[in-house]
Regions:
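A structural signal for short hydrophobic beta-strand segments in well-ordered beta-sheet cores
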Residues: 52, 70, 196-198
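Alpha-helix boundary/capping residues
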Residues: 16, 111, 166-169
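Glycine-rich phosphate-binding loop signature in dinucleotide/nucleotide-binding domains
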Residues: 52-53, 113-114, 155
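Metallo-beta-lactamase
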Residues: 22-43, 56-145
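Residue-level detector of conserved, well-ordered beta-strand and adjacent loop positions
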Residues: 47, 61, 208
Length: 210
């Protein structure tokens, strides 16, 4: 809905290989959510480790930069850090930190260390074994990283192309948008791990196997 953000998304999807007609459709979907967004007028900025009414603030970057969970008496208010039946989207966006998937995997480690007895998430039912769910999500991303490596070869692929290899052909624009972002976060994690290479071809970012 924000014109400046929409322009950044257009440039972002073009940078990662989406054709212009597809880019317009992908970005157009973002305006759908605008009526549902309400911003806090005077936000209180807080950091991990601080207390808010007796709740400990726990860093949980990955799904969103700067995301914080609340922990008290074994109860974790988990926002979208942990979900019971689906996996939170962990994507690379124009304003993202450089390694959102690495951030997310580290946050899942932290969840296991804290070992809360229950987690209340932003979607779905309460999670009665948060540490176990964190391990399941780590395994999901380990397998997705393996898929990403297997999908890469000597021929350069864009994030847009990679999203078809990882998520298939039959996606609506809103799902394709997230699929591209997720493909990029996994590709960048592999680049940082030395298992893939990032290149550029005519102003478009590409990835190959290392």
């Amino acid at each position: 809905g924000n014109p400046a953000w929409s322009e950044r998304l257009v440039d972002w999807f073009r940078l990662h290989g989406a054709p212009d007609d597809v880019t317009a459709e992908l970005v157009g979907q973002s305006s759908f959510y605008r009526p549902f967004i309400r911003y806090q007028r005077d936000p209180l900025l807080m950091r991990e480790g601080e207390l808010l009414d007796g709740w400990q603030l726990v860093g949980a970057a990955g799904h969103a930069d700067g995301q914080l969970c609340l922990l008290k008496d074994g109860v974790l208010i988990a926002a979208d850090h942990l979900l019971d039946r689906i996996t939170p989207t962990v994507g690379l966006w124009p304003a993202s930190r450089p390694d959102p998937l690495g951030d997310y995997l580290a946050a899942l480690d932290r969840t296991q260390e804290l070992d809360p007895r229950i987690a209340l998430s932003g979607h779905g039912e309460p999670i009665e074994d948060p540490a176990g769910r964190a391990r399941e999500l780590q395994e999901h991303h380990r397998l997705r990283l393996e898929e990403t490596v297997a999908s890469l070869g000597p021929e350069p692929q864009t994030g847009y192309e990679l999203s078809f290899a990882l998520f298939g052909d039959d996606l609506k624009p809103v799902s394709r948008r997230f699929a591209i972002a997720e493909s990029l976060s996994h590709a960048e994690r592999l680049v940082l791990a030395g298992a893939a290479r990032r290149g550029e071809d005519g102003g478009t970012v590409t990835y190959t196997a290392a």
